[in-house]
A protein has these predicted regions:
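Generic structural signal for helix capping and beta-alpha/helix-loop junctions
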Residues: 13, 45-47, 70, 108, ...
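Short N-terminal targeting/anchoring amphipathic segment
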Residues: 87-108, 121-124, 128
Length: 158
């Protein structure tokens, strides 16, 4: 089976951060599946557009995007939507049988649902954060318009 795996913050063992998606994808490959990972490259890069690498049999499609925890909320939201738009286009260009998308951010649901409908294939959505409840509780989403939009995205995704 050809599996499209969407995770904006995919990490390999030599990168800092969690490797849950890497481990899942690696094991799916080991079971005989083809896995196509769509993710972002968050470090400085010479690449200006998508580039592909192979990691333990996983076809990893990287989109260079500038992202930092030091960004403002507005800057982060722009990055999330930029990645969603570009990954939606990339997703429909791949010939796959099923889509597996994992959050966070919740905007990963946008390219997953779009590609699922466009390609007429099933989609599985893994929720790994209670969003937007968590950022609201933490005080990160204070603006009423932002909260409203976050709740609309939540209804769409869930």
């Amino acid at each position: 089976m050809k599996i499209l795996y969407l995770h904006q913050y995919f990490n390999t063992p030599d990168m800092s951060g969690g490797t849950r998606s890497y481990e899942m994808a690696r094991r799916l490959v080991k079971m005989g599946h083809e896995v196509y990972m769509i993710t972002s490259w968050r470090e400085n890069s010479d690449h200006k557009t998508w580039y592909e690498t192979a990691v333990e049999g996983i076809h990893v499609h990287w989109l260079p995007v500038n992202y930092s925890n030091h960004m403002s909320n507005i800057e982060r939201i722009k990055v999330f939507f930029k990645f969603a738009l570009f990954s939606a286009r990339k997703a429909v260009s791949l010939k796959v049988d099923i889509i597996f998308a994992t959050s966070t951010p919740l905007t990963i649901a946008l390219p997953a649902v779009y590609a699922s409908r466009k390609l007429k294939i099933p989609m599985v959505f893994e929720v790994r954060d209670l969003w937007p409840e968590l950022p609201i509780a933490m005080g990160a989403l204070k603006n009423p318009v932002t909260r409203f939009m976050a709740h609309r995205l939540e209804k769409f995704a869930y």
